[in-house]
Amino acid sequence: MYLQKINLKNKYALVTGAGKGLGRACSIALAEAGATVIALSRTSSDLNKLEKDIKKVKGKIIKVSCDVMNYEDLKQKLEKIKIIDVLVNNAGTNIPEPFEKIKQKSMNYLVDLNLKAAFNVAQLVVKKMLKNKKRPGSIINMSSQLGHVGMSGRNVYNMTKFGIEGLTKGMGVELAKKKYPS
């Protein structure tokens, strides 16, 4: 992995959606670079598999079973974590449906997971990062090419990823005023 050239020893990296896909790959790469990975996933079995793979690269992991869409659970779990140096805000999914057939349930789920949960995670982590002035952190909000261009059958996904782009830009402007990296 390319991150092996980056030294993240003694750093703590929180990854949402860590059990599968990009979140899993990021978690392993961060562990290879020396970070202690704080892996959030709804599925304990995915966290257990990730733990085995991180141990294979001699990495460290803190497993947190958590549904990022449940604000109170998320807040409670994050309160137990003392230091976060890196946030990889990755949890998300897509439910492809033609525009005229999009179900409210699907739309609400995608907005709750892809956008609202990302906002909530970022806000809670930034509060923690700002308290720790000696250890400025980095925030990576995972988006998609579909946060820049539209695609047929992906309208709600497009909407949430455009929202992530706006959130990230807004956070960058606001946090820069605090002389804090976004």
What would you call each of these model-derived segments?
Residues 127, 173-177:
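Alpha-helical segment proximal to the catalytic Tyr-Lys
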Residues 102, 150-158, 170:
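Active-site loop-to-helix junction immediately N-terminal to the catalytic Tyr of the SDR YXXXK motif
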Residues 122, 160, 168:
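Active-site helix of classical SDR
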Residues 98-99, 103-111:
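Substrate-binding pocket helix/loop in short-chain dehydrogenase/reductase
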